């Protein structure tokens, strides 16, 4: 990668005269570019209009090499290309001098030239130019950029099944954003939320996607240069199917099919009994139907987290053959089925990595998706797969699941580390995952920053930030260093403040409940000690929202560290109840305090106490006692969250790209206020179970303005009950706003399951 500014025609040394976009301009696109719909030219015209109010003309052209071009960029005049149209921006191909996906962008006073080694290279160059236009128009810096990605496959993985089904309109909007940040693959994850024929008992009431939705979205993605890849659970994660009357006999534990629905159990008990002959036919049916809707040859069969394999109906077979052999045999059959139909199978690699003997039993043409989500992840498992000779994507996470607010430090640390390891060990792709466990309570817009982190690191994982060797600066293809440096060249006195903020409080989800890893730092302490995360947040805020202060994303980052009682805690509290007043021991065994940043010794002690509880009331009290070091800080957390909301709102009001800010900021503010209510719920529940001693006045003050203190006495159980009821009412009012925001980007889906948790907590406060 090179970034070279031209010498200035006038002015002080080191301060080149910027290039002014003309009042009347044209964008010309070489007809050899595979962009029949003119998407790239239209993207540029749209961004120029948004930045300047001027609508440029668009022309298609046939470039002729070897002749002087009317707008030849003087900084890179050879080879020149003649055009039939006088255009200020030219898009063209030059496969003789540039590699596939590589591009060269020249901004000169005589015009702008975007050249690609292939169509995707042109697309990549156009996206860099768009980012510069968004930050600098109408005056752009003079420069030449030549660049290509570290990873040829830069994918995003979107959960559309664990409670939330995005609308087709929102999916298209998200694909637009992925294109801007140079992603070229999107995997859409389905368990039960697709309208498969003859499986209506599985998908009923979930607002399932239809075949026409997939066909339309596949076409839309293809026009943007994004490969839409099907991803369907075909082994594990069949919780909803295994609860139906028609299909329960295919599960490891069909006798449990009528247990009360639970977010916790949904993540644990969902594995097919592969000794049942119909199971393979069931998986084949899903594959055969779904793959027909996509133009890609790739297919992700998933195959992850098969926790119950060999524990239920298949236990005798496991005792005879071993779980590893059973797993490898079933996955191999699925992969061969796809290969015989001209498809390229891929699968999640967690089981194979934990049982490495599986790696030698799988077909050679299978791509392993090596998901490793711990913020402090090491390179061992990436090296293991590389040494086994298996092609792999390394897969990181945006860290939004199970919470209202995104854990941006965890996301950045995980994404940046893993991108380096993948390059080191020759990974063939980089995939950023966006999960929605526990009902997908996380608003889809909370993933924007993590998505951009991933785009940056997939493009240039070895770049530097603030002089610190690390992963992911903006000199690649996301929160682009090009665009950032361009903005610096045009705005000499640009503000770059992170701003002072209160010390962060414990996060509700530090650590990694997927791998058992731990965060780099004590809960609540920003993990990016070298300042790289803060700098990336600032750059994301500027390129995405036009927020030069960085305050929008930085406030969101800080808010995630103010969790005294989180969504996962509310789910745990409710689902400790079997549904009939008895303690749910299976749910209790899934609760790990390590994901809250507590030390291993402390977490193990309280987890053992929880499992030793004899009834529901004792279990809930024990859970709250274990979490009490966080819960008692609710007042401090809510005061800080109020400050975060004000900082975020003020920064959004000053943002130059108000349209983009208005699209996301309401969801951010709602998440912050929701967390304030959740913190109060934890405080009231802890008081109700005699875990802490607070009076009504303490609770009202802890609300930081959400509840006015009562003029009467705040002592006594009646006053505490009254303020708890007011918390319940406030929580329910907030939830109606949350529902409105949900419906703005998602179908109704399984919103009622989230409502059930919210209302059960509200009812507990009233009891």
Predicted features along the sequence, with ranges:
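N-terminal small/glycine-rich loop or linker at the start of catalytic domains
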Residues: 144-161, 394-401
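Beta-rich nucleic-acid/ligand-interaction surfaces
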Residues: 64-67, 79-81, 196-197, 201-203, ...
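Conserved beta-strand edge residues that scaffold enzyme active sites
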Residues: 63, 192-193, 234-236, 352, ...
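Contiguous, structured surface segment used for ligand recognition
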Residues: 1-154, 417, 424, 429, ...
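Substrate-binding cleft of carbohydrate-active enzyme catalytic domains
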Residues: 152-349, 359-361, 367-369, 378, ...
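Substrate-binding groove of N-acetylhexosamine-processing glycoside hydrolases
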Residues: 2-4, 9-15, 28-30, 34-42, ...
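A structural preference for short, hydrophobic beta-strand core positions in alpha/beta folds
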Residues: 58-60, 230, 347, 394
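Short catalytic/ligand-binding loop motif for oxyanion handling, primarily in non-cytosolic enzymes
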Residues: 123, 237-239, 309, 438-442
